[in-house]
């Protein structure tokens, strides 16, 4: 160490340097929360868990963006509570409020557009959802399907699965944090494939995500 200064100052070949990648700085986390009316009874708990997670990532210098989605009056609204470098914005997560419907396919398409704009490489996309897409605006008829269909059940799940596939193709595979009923677990797997983590309850949200991020960081270091 006493000779370390000689390498850059004098070009001393006896001393070499090696850049150690900052794996914490390489990882970026996107968190997307289902804010439809189905989350009404646990919205305070969701907000608290989201805040705990964002605060922990902020202290670890891991950039995180927190978003939510719901559909109101035929429009799918994507709300941003804090951006990657907005370290003072965690308190806004407590503004999380559940209302309206959830058109999951359109929400995933919007997120795909946002992620492709930013162009980050080491990204972890986490989606907290009950995997029960449902909207009052019908699916339009396309191709061999001449008539419009309700946005619910199999057609809605298929629509969301198609958009999840596009996210994977664009290099941003979504990881589903499933918080729904037993009967909707198969829908979660249809949409997200093997990338489904079932939460025993919303109270396990921050702890579960912490373990996922720890595993991703270990993978980056290896």
Predicted regions and their residues:
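Acidic, glycine-rich A-domain
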Residues: 1-222
